[in-house]
Amino acid sequence: MKTDGGNTWRASHSKPLNTANTMGEPFSHSEYSVHADQSEFYLNELTEHSGQDNPCMNTSRLNTNRYGHPVVHPCPKIHCICTQSNIAAIGSDCTGCVDIAQACKMLRGGLGCTQDPCVKNPHTQCFTDVSNHAMRNVLPLNVSNTEQFPIQIEYANGRNPVLNPMDDLAMRAALLLSKDIDLQNTHILPSTRISIEKNIPVAAGLAGGSADAAAVLLGINSAWQTNYSRCDLLGKAGALGADVPFLIWGGAAYGSGTGSCVTFFETQTLYWVLCFSKHPLSTRKVFQELDRQRSGAGCNHHPVFSNPAECAEMLKKAIKRGPEALAALLHNDLTSAAKMLMPEIAERIKAAERCPGILRAIISGSGPTLALLAEDAEAANRACSILKDTGVICKAVSSPAYSSIYWQT
């Protein structure tokens, strides 16, 4: 992230656990920063949110920028900041949807903060260091003031994983906002070019494209000053895919319907190992195979999640009890379809669950990446080392990550 001059506002967004038969994948995380004076807009996509929690900061380092937003000057190692002012803003955006005090409590608990929630004082800070264990895509977005209004997507390595530009979720996210703007009644919007340096595996079940789409919605909303609320963007995100709304908010949550109905959970930090495959798996083909399997006999619905009304409450209780209780509920309806298309997944799951301290292994999203829930951080790191010795490409991560935003001058 460039910090030399200009007003900057920056946010990070991540997905919750995929503990039910939802269409979402866990662990993807996107963040953006906009340099208004320099007209440069950067997005980073991460696969996790991890690190040692830092104590709450006082308000002595805070003031406001020209837009009246809180300004902070964090340690260079701090990648994510959670402010009570942002939670208050979420509350005002979602009147009746979010209890501000409860949201503050949820954020504080996840970040290990011991300070009492402060709704009246919007400048109370909680910091968390996520400088370690990061895997990220970098997306510079260049904005220029011209009378043209093109939106260009290019890939830094010269290889676009999406053959049809209109299938690119980042492009679709940008176009989604541009369609709502009446250029006759507003200033001419700048031309926009996004260059994506892809580091997260494509077609891996990690929602990399969806994370980019969510960050583009939030980032362009700021860069173009379209002033949509977070709830407005939540509704728009659902049009891009059922998993994109997760990334607008972050945290741990249960999504139902088309993904726009989200129930948030308070949760302790959970430790995982992501095991990657050398070969991609098409989401479209996995769902086609699932449809084929469900059209005949032997439809494999998980009984625990057959009643959506009870699912959120069951997950909430399990998460509070700890990883062992949560492991008993982990299930992915796409598993049988993914195994049919890539039979080696079955053996990979068995090998992973033989590692000491691994409670459960499931496929992430539509696969083929596996998500291994560990007892604790030590077990996750130990399993990661064991699997690496057998040639498995893997990474120890933690969850959940929280949606946050800050401004810096």
From Swiss-Prot:
InterPro entries: GHMP_kinase_C_dom (IPR013750), GHMP_kinase_C_sf (IPR036554), GHMP_kinase_N_dom (IPR006204), IspE (IPR004424), Ribosomal_Su5_D2-typ_SF (IPR020568), Ribsml_uS5_D2-typ_fold_subgr (IPR014721). Transmembrane segments: none annotated. Pathway: Isoprenoid biosynthesis; isopentenyl diphosphate biosynthesis via DXP pathway; isopentenyl diphosphate from 1-deoxy-D-xylulose 5-phosphate: step 3/6. It comes from the Bacteria. This is 4-diphosphocytidyl-2-C-methyl-D-erythritol kinase. ATP binds at P201, V202, A203, A204, G205, L206, A207, G208, G209, S210, A211. It comes from Tropheryma whipplei (strain Twist). Catalyzes the phosphorylation of the position 2 hydroxy group of 4-diphosphocytidyl-2C-methyl-D-erythritol. Residues 1-22 have a biased composition (Polar residues). GO terms for biological process: isopentenyl diphosphate biosynthetic process, methylerythritol 4-phosphate pathway; terpenoid biosynthetic process.
